[in-house]
Amino acid sequence: MAAQFPAQSPNQTGLAPAPRLPIDMLHLAKQALGDPGLELEVLRLFDEVVRVNVLRLEEATSAPDVLRHLHTIRGASVGVGAWGLAQHAHIMEVELRDGAEVNVEHIQDIRISAEEVRAFIAERIAAAPDYAD
């Protein structure tokens, strides 16, 4: 499976750039209008959306249920800039809409990507100053 958004790609010097973060923080900053407190709140909400929908995805028993959770994961991921997770969900969503069977390996890929994103969020929240005023 070719990656649409590779984590690394050679630049003009032939050297690969640093690995991409699980969340594009520039995109998130733009979405939160540059408000660091709002960024953290968005990350907290996104973390819960991902947690719940990955769990429901793993428990889903029908293709429509799987599609609904994939679509939610993809949409939420695009909103915060979690491009890798969005890509995994998008690929599986397209395959299912094209008539493929539910692929357990793709669900595992989504779970692994979600765990990476959630760990990144936990680190960001733990390291953040208190913005409550």
What residue spans do the PLM features occupy?
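Two-component system phosphorelay core
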Residues: M1-D133
